């Protein structure tokens, strides 16, 4: 989990409460924020300052700054409850967005009259970097720029340029002008994030005079560098996902508003940012009490909702809950139930022994899997573990399989193109593992036991119509491996853990015709084994013969 270091005096000032070390250690964990340590450090002036290090859950990016953390703590302690609404003043500041294929989404906002000092500047920079990781995936999904607005002049333009089209002084090079291409070749940040630039097309933000504010997602210009004397801050967020860009902007402007800043809108191609419109959800009182095992009345639940920084209205057995724009973690009603539990107080829940006595034991399937693992290791195999997420290319195309979309589950918003499908088979991932380890000596014998996910339209137990099935797969590669070797290993496994099995000839696109068999148990196919087809071997950029098997355990 990400951690943040917070100045204790600053936390007290923003929380509007005096905090003892014991109070910090007792109360913050009850609102879901772990206290790692309380320590002292020497600041730039040579004075000792008491600091607190917190661990922040990834689902609460608004807690990644002392401003957001203090806001949440004020509500939790009942100092200020309900929604803290932030006014957005209108302006005539405009941003023109030209076509940008690399990072197509952008949002801007201005926060004026921020009470800035060294402490606030450090907090702002830390929030920026933490959000780069927590939401931005190290700037791949989004990048954040914060500028001294008084150094530039509106309107602004966001566009793409070629690598040698413009020169400016980047942060860290106080007097040396560089082109974007030179930045990714010489600048520390440029080298680190050069992989995010495609086809020599560089996103850039300039003002009306052509002055460069930022070269996202790499570096800002020195011209707009924020200092402790800056008070009017222009924020830009650029990225590949519109929702993430807008939510991140909301988190930052609300944090700066805690420093007495005034939020001012910016017109981006006709749309005004930031959009701090409240979200709403409807949830029943009955479902809340059922989930929490309590009998709370509407008033008690509304009080807990208000302590979480939200508002609620009771109507016909339901609550209409209003959610602030900086809360991007409320995705489902179960999230509201968790917030109610936290702010009602976990310490108020009474522990009860179950009415039925139970004795813990190992899951029979896991027990069987552990025994299988021991046997495979005894046969000279090394165990590997791959992700359940994969992609169509690895699972199907490289295996010469033709599969329709309805036969597998695809992730709606994948983090990367390599991880966008839930695997239906383990063997392709073992071939991928062999490719990664092709520089190691032969023979190589590997296996994996793990879950695959399939679509089951006849499943009546879940809403998803999907279920996990446990499989085991193995692969061997060396110049002399053959059908008999994999048959021997497969039979050893089957004799130990399966009864009354038999083999039948099997035509599988990933295997050499005539050198593949399927495993039949109780009249059903439970697996297969054989020699991998040379075309498949080449698809995975491997060189030596490979044999493999895959068996369904459960």
Curated annotation (Swiss-Prot):
Annotated localization: Cytoplasm
GO molecular function: ATP binding; magnesium ion binding; phenylalanine-tRNA ligase activity; RNA binding
UniProt entry keywords in alphabetical sequence: Aminoacyl-tRNA synthetase, ATP-binding, Cytoplasm, Ligase, Magnesium, Metal-binding, Nucleotide-binding, Protein biosynthesis
InterPro entries: aa-tRNA-synth_II/BPL/LPL, B3/B4_tRNA-bd, DNA-bd_dom_put_sf, Phe-tRNA-ligase_IIc_bsu, Phe-tRNA-synth_IIc_bsu_arc_euk, Phe-tRNA_synthase-like_B3/B4, Phe_tRNA_ligase_beta2_arc, PheRS_beta_core
One of the protein's GO biological processes: phenylalanyl-tRNA aminoacylation
Catalytic reactions on record: tRNA(Phe) + L-phenylalanine + ATP = L-phenylalanyl-tRNA(Phe) + AMP + diphosphate + H(+)
One Pfam entry name: PhetRS_B1
Chain positions recorded as Mg(2+) binding sites: 329, 335, 338-339
Domain of life of the organism encoding this protein: Archaea
E.C. code: 6.1.1.20
Residue span(s) of domain B5: 276-351
Main location: cytoplasm
Cofactor(s) the protein requires to work: Mg(2+)
Enzyme class: ligase
GO cellular component: phenylalanine-tRNA ligase complex
Subunit note: Tetramer of two alpha and two beta subunits.
Family of this protein: Belongs to the phenylalanyl-tRNA synthetase beta subunit family. Type 2 subfamily.
The protein's name: Phenylalanine--tRNA ligase beta subunit
Gene of this entry: pheT
